């Protein structure tokens, strides 16, 4: 076993042990802090990771308990926030067989900037508009999310209706609200467009949505009928018991085939996942299992992702540690372009966050990827290509105001 991976596993085990032993303390986007007089830690375990109160605040359509919300002209401040990440990285790529170093990258960069407006547009009507640019990759300034939620169709947010471009994810395990700069390899979060019914009641949080499928224009555009895209649906639920959360989710959608012919217009892709968030004292443990089948339009081809993550609050509201291990395992189907020779890999990340103030943190992080290719997370890019071993050392700043 690689000594770095062994070290990460030891750190994760220690974090889990300490999390059981340390006393628990009960723990916002800056725009919400200004409007409601809240501290960031009222909604976040550590920015951007939500606590239980933050999850309920979001699912209520950005309303506090027993409040209906206001019109924009009644607000005491503009509901707008800016969020950004800057980083210095030193990355290396090695031959998976000889271990010889193939390349080295060393640079400072602005990774991403976001503008976000969120709050209530009227009593019981919440909204979120998020726009972002991946500056380091030269990406465009684009729309991440734009949705409205009509809350309290059944009282106390037992049932809400949300529509627009939004995220299909669990609130306790989110690509957008992770501590690490390194993204999750597992299919944790999907950006979808459509309508969703959601709510929470007596420790149960739930949602079901009908959304556009995952098909996109391909090489043979004429063979892809994108006039009937509203063919995806999903449902998820989670239950909180003794401060721990268990979640399940099912996704059924259409996706483009990886074969150029004869299947162009996509086949059904399905996903079933289960997650467990164990929250002890000042620590958390996240476990995830993700099963995809009929991936890439290939009948019966499946892929499994496994995720283990531990987080520890070493100094209250100041110093946090995070360690994560992920593995991707793809089944074999004769003639498929997605077989294990091109679709397996592992990812290990070790992370330290120090909060200078509640909305500004300094980050140090190490990530190692071992992959054989397709859909293995290349460092810095979700669902990219990792054709060899890669490792990255990173120093960064994450801020919101």
What residue ranges belong to the model's regions?
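The canonical Cys-X-X-Cys-His
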Residues: 37-47
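Outer-membrane beta-barrel pore domains
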Residues: 101-103, 146-150, 154, 240-401
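Short Fe-S-cluster ligation motifs
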Residues: 66-85
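Outer membrane beta-barrel
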Residues: 51-52, 79-90, 102-216, 229-233, ...
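C-terminal segment of classical bacterial N-terminal signal peptides
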Residues: 16-25
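Bacterial N-terminal signal peptides that target proteins for export
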Residues: 1-11
């Amino acid at each position: 076993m690689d000594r770095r991976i062994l070290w990460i596993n030891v750190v994760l085990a220690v974090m889990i042990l300490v999390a059981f032993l340390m006393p628990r303390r009960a723990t916002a986007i800056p725009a919400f802090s200004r409007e409601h007089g809240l501290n960031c830690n009222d909604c976040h375990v550590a920015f951007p990771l939500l606590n239980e109160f933050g999850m309920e605040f979001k699912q209520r359509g950005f309303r506090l308990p027993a409040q209906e919300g206001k019109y924009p002209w009644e607000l005491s401040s503009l509901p707008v926030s800016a969020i950004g990440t800057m980083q210095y990285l030193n990355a290396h790529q090695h031959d998976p067989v000889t271990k010889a170093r193939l390349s080295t990258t060393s640079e400072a960069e602005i990774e991403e900037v976001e503008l976000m407006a969120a709050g209530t547009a009227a009593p019981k009507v919440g909204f979120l508009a998020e726009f972002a640019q991946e500056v380091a990759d030269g990406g465009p300034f684009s729309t991440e999310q734009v949705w409205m939620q009509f809350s309290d169709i059944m009282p106390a947010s037992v049932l809400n209706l949300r529509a627009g471009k939004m995220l299909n994810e669990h609130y306790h395990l989110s690509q957008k609200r992770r501590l690490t700069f390194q993204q999750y390899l597992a299919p944790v979060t999907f950006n979808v467009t459509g309508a969703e019914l959601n709510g929470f009641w007596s420790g149960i949080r739930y949602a079901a949505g009908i959304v556009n499928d995952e098909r996109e224009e391909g090489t043979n555009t004429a063979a892809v009928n994108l006039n009937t895209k509203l063919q995806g649906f999903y449902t998820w639920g989670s239950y909180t018991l003794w401060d721990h959360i268990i979640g399940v989710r099912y996704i059924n959608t259409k996706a483009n085939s990886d074969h150029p012919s004869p299947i162009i217009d996509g086949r059904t892709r399905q996903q079933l996942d289960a997650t467990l968030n164990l929250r002890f004292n000042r620590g958390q443990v996240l476990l995830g299992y993700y099963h995809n089948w009929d991936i890439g339009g290939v009948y019966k081809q499946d892929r499994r992702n496994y995720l283990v993550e531990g987080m520890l609050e070493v100094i209250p509201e100041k110093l946090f540690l995070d360690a994560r291990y992920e593995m991707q395992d793809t089944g074999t189907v004769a003639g498929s372009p997605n077989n294990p020779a091109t679709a397996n890999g592992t990812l290990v990340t070790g992370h330290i966050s120090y909060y200078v103030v509640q909305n500004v943190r300094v980050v140090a992080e190490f990530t190692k990827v071992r992959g054989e290719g397709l859909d293995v997370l290349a460092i810095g890019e979700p669902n990219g290509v990792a054709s060899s071993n890669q490792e990255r050392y990173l120093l960064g700043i994450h801020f919101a105001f």
